[in-house]
Amino acid sequence: AKQSLLSVRGLFININKGVIISWLIAYVVMGAAYGSIYGDMQTFLESNEMMKQMFSHTGFSIEESFTGTVMMVLIGLVSILPIAIVNKLFSEERRLHLSQIYATKVTRSQLYWTSIGLSILSGLLGVLLAAGSLGGTAISAMGNSGEMDIVDFFAAGFNLFPTVLFFIGLAALALGWAPKLGKIVYIYLTFSFLLNYFSGLIDLPEWFLNTAIQSWMPQMPMDDFEASVFLTVTIISIALIVIGFLGYSRRDMNEGA
């Protein structure tokens, strides 16, 4: 066996390598695609009344309004990869691919936390690449007319990182207590994304909007950073991950299920 496969970390990276690389490339491409619009933003929005309604906010430049919404879209996409990595642990378990590992001194704790660690790292990389690609392309497209710099784009992206952690927490909770429900996390992600994306077009009650985790977060650069919200969502996410671990360390393995 390759040296890289002799550790749990190396094995997990190898198992997820293809999907990680594919998604990271997709984030760069999507960021660049949205970023290229910044050079001709006014024309782009005036050509479509619905887009204008979605991306225009009173008191803010078109670029700032657009960035707040587009970053939410990109970070929603970034959340898919960490969920897939956490769910992969169960699919490997179900296919009996982990049987030999269970027979060694490797503990469930190592398997769980390696999977969680890899999902968090992939989420961080995803935000970095998506925000960097969007910002770099946007600044290039705007030239000297732009009011935003690369720091604004990274701040807007990493401000939403707790939502990525929250989806990791939900996937971890499912993995630990009801692993066959892991796919439902994708449904909630889609629901949250659509609710936020179209919230400017549809008049929905506040309580309903707040069922989407993204609604809890300020939309930078239009809104100011809120440390209390950032920490609250992060702590809730960590709690979900820990509760997931308690279930995973106790439940029966679903080998061949």
Task: Annotate each language-model stretch with its function.
Residues 114-171, 234:
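Secretory targeting signals
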Residues 160-194:
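A structural motif at transmembrane helix-loop-helix junctions in multipass membrane proteins
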Residues 65-89:
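Long, hydrophobic alpha-helical segments
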